[in-house]
UniProtKB/Swiss-Prot annotation:
GO cellular component: cell surface; extracellular region; phosphopyruvate hydratase complex
Cofactor mode of binding and number, as noted: Binds a second Mg(2+) ion via substrate during catalysis.
Binding site for Mg(2+): D244, E285, D312
Pathway assigned in UniProt: Carbohydrate degradation; glycolysis; pyruvate from D-glyceraldehyde 3-phosphate: step 4/5
Compartment(s) where it occurs, according to its Swiss-Prot or TrEMBL record: Cytoplasm; Secreted; Cell surface
Protein name per its UniProtKB record: Enolase
Domain of life per record: Bacteria
Pfam families in UniProt: Enolase_C, Enolase_N
Main location: cytoplasm
Recorded name of the encoding gene: eno
Listed EC numbers: 4.2.1.11
Active site: E207 (proton donor), K337 (proton acceptor)
The species this protein was found in: Wolbachia sp. subsp. Brugia malayi (strain TRS)
GO terms assigned for molecular function: magnesium ion binding; phosphopyruvate hydratase activity
Length: 425
């Protein structure tokens, strides 16, 4: 087989959706094929995720420049991988891991290693004249992901009083991905009208969801249910609800402090139980703190049979942590974020471990995004069946949805889409 030899590697500093710098990498092969990838950035980050290398120079971009990561790509990384076969992804990623030599990519930065890893895969796919999802996933990559769509932002993603970070709609009644997006967009616009009529701001947060200055979780959920019904849908047949609590942000000294409440782990689990009884919530992310292992076990025992319990900060796309969670029965699903681990190979290894343990995998964006659509392709290549990539506004979010709509059109009858409650089974 002809090798796809890397001829040139180049990185630059560009801006993400929050106006902060991030790393973009371009790789050119000897046959002229190229691949370009840009790296996202999180605001709500797990303690154990791979390090995003920043310059810490307050005179540039408020200390958030990424010239150190860019220098690493253009220097030590380029010197190591030029001449390597871009189609040998595992060898390239192994070289990146060994070059860094730390457990959390703190030497070169996960923003440097991931940019190179993704750009290399894209260059190889283009050399083979294949879409990235087909190159990565083979002929069996045909499952369109079920979207978990953020419609109200809170927490560190918005300047409002909501403690919970994301309120999501789950279009369980749609029979195709494009239909799920259409239905969800209709609910989104109905929610905008409702917020305006009630005198709330319709400004959006980092992930494109509305960020009204409401104070309670219940009011946010009531508004969403109203929007669903105003769009002529129901929570029985068309939509369920989801939450990203991001509870680590309000957990301290074994107490959860939010909305004028101070709850123990046991009390918070009971609060969630009552919330699920009142509202059609079928997915909850980071409902317990990443440090509260006993709380996670309590929650999983109480709600794990009826609600998808997604671990993000708990697992940070790290196989060691995923293995521990599966063994100790914490959560029942894993959020997969490539920049939490730093290479494409490690990302797919984490997905494989998640699936083999009987857990669900949810491919995810970050709150600081670019127009890069790689996660859309990873979702299909891995046949994971779920994606979380923000709301139905802001082009950095819509780029991912639009790419999936294009892929669905390309797959035509071969596209599989699990709706109703099948996406969690």
């Amino acid at each position: 087989m002809t090798k796809r030899i890397i001829n040139n590697v180049f990185a630059r500093e560009i801006l993400d959706s929050r106006g902060y710098p991030t790393v973009e990498v371009e790789i050119e092969l000897c046959d002229g094929a190229t691949g370009r990838a840009s790296v996202p950035s999180g605001a709500s980050t797990g303690k154990l995720e791979a390090l995003e290398l920043r310059d810490q120079d307050e005179k540039r971009y408020c200390g958030k420049g990424v010239l150190k990561a860019v220098k690493a790509v253009n220097g030590v990384i380029a010197n190591a991988i030029i001449g390597m076969d871009a189609a040998d992804q595992s060898t390239i990623d192994k070289a990146l891991i060994e070059l860094d030599g730390t457990r959390n990519k703190s030497k070169l930065g996960a923003n440097a290693t991931l940019g190179v890893s993704l750009a290399s895969a894209k260059a190889a796919a283009n050399s083979f004249k294949m879409p990235l999802y087909r190159y990565l996933g083979g002929e069996q990559a045909n499952v369109m992901p079920f979207p978990l769509i953020n419609i109200i932002n809170g927490g560190v993603h918005a300047d409002n009083k909501l403690d919970f970070q994301e309120f999501m709609i789950l279009p369980i009644g749609a029979e195709a991905f494009s239909e799920a997006i259409r239905m969800s967009a209709e609910v989104f616009h109905n929610l905008r009208s409702i917020l305006r009529k009630r005198g709330y701001s319709t400004n959006v947060g980092d992930e494109g969801g509305f960020a009204p200055n409401i104070e309670s979780t219940e009011e946010a959920l009531d508004l969403i249910v109203h929007a669903i019904e105003s769009a002529s849908y129901s929570t029985q047949n068309h939509f369920a609800l989801g939450l990203d609590v991001a509870s680590s942000t309000f957990y301290k000294n074994k107490i959860y402090k939010f909305a004028n409440k101070e709850l123990t782990s046991e009390e918070l689990v009971e609060y969630y139980y009552n919330l699920v009884e009142k509202y059609p919530i079928t997915s909850m992310e980071d409902a317990m703190s990443e440090d509260d292992y006993e709380g996670w076990k309590l929650l999983t025992a109480k709600l794990g049979s009826k609600v998808q319990l997604v671990g993000d900060d708990l697992f940070v796309t790290n196989c060691e942590l995923i293995r521990k969670g599966i063994e100790e029965k914490m959560a029942n699903a894993v959020l997969i974020k490539p920049n939490q681990i730093g290479t494409l190979t490690e990302t797919f290894t984490a997905i494989g471990m998640t699936k083999s343990g009987g857990y669900k995998a949810v491919i995810s964006h970050r709150s600081g995004e670019t127009e890069d659509t790689t996660i859309s392709h990873i979702a299909i290549a891995s046949n994971c069946g779920q994606i979380k990539t923000g709301s139905l506004s802001r082009s950095d979010r819509l780029a991912k949805y639009n790419e999936l709509i294009r892929i669905e059109g390309t797959l035509e009858r071969n596209a599989k889409y699990y709706y109703g409650l099948a996406w969690t089974s």
